[in-house]
């Protein structure tokens, strides 16, 4: 974040391929609302008590490819609004218009840095949204999942943001 003074920043996994050429225009259109701080492509409207975003009802749309399958993941087809407000987004793609410090003091790996950053944006008073997409804006070619430290970081997340709720 400190490497650039750009107002808008996009954080993207190394295994994500963008498929919508003009997505930046959609992102800028959404960011015209100054109350929106972050945009993701997959998120949850209500973060579950166990802190695991993937255990909640998700919204968004991506193509996904991993060791088990290759498919279009559709979590929501609600096209009544240009976007849906969420409590957390997946870190595969995060666009921001404000600089909120990452909690590198707590999260040093692949797990929970994204949900933590989502909580930091909410604490700062900003909305987090997932845009309506008629087709996915990216392919996530995740291959093998490495969850070696997932439970460790989940407990840290729960302690920091959810009062130690250890479901």
Model regions and ranges:
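Short, conserved alpha-helix that lines the donor NDP-sugar binding/gating region
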Residues: 1-2, 119
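Active-site acidic Asp-centered loop
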Residues: 12-14
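A recurrent flexible, glycine/aromatic-enriched loop bordering the glycosyltransferase active site
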Residues: 73-96
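Conserved donor NDP-sugar-binding/catalytic core segment of glycosyltransferases
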Residues: 17, 22-62
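Short aromatic/hydrophobic "clamp" motif used to bind/position activated sugar donors
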Residues: 9
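C-terminal catalytic/acceptor-binding lobe
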Residues: 88, 105-167
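A generic structural signal for short hydrophobic patches within well-formed alpha-helices
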Residues: 99-102
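Short, high-confidence coil segments that cap the C-terminus of an alpha-helix
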Residues: 6, 35-36, 126
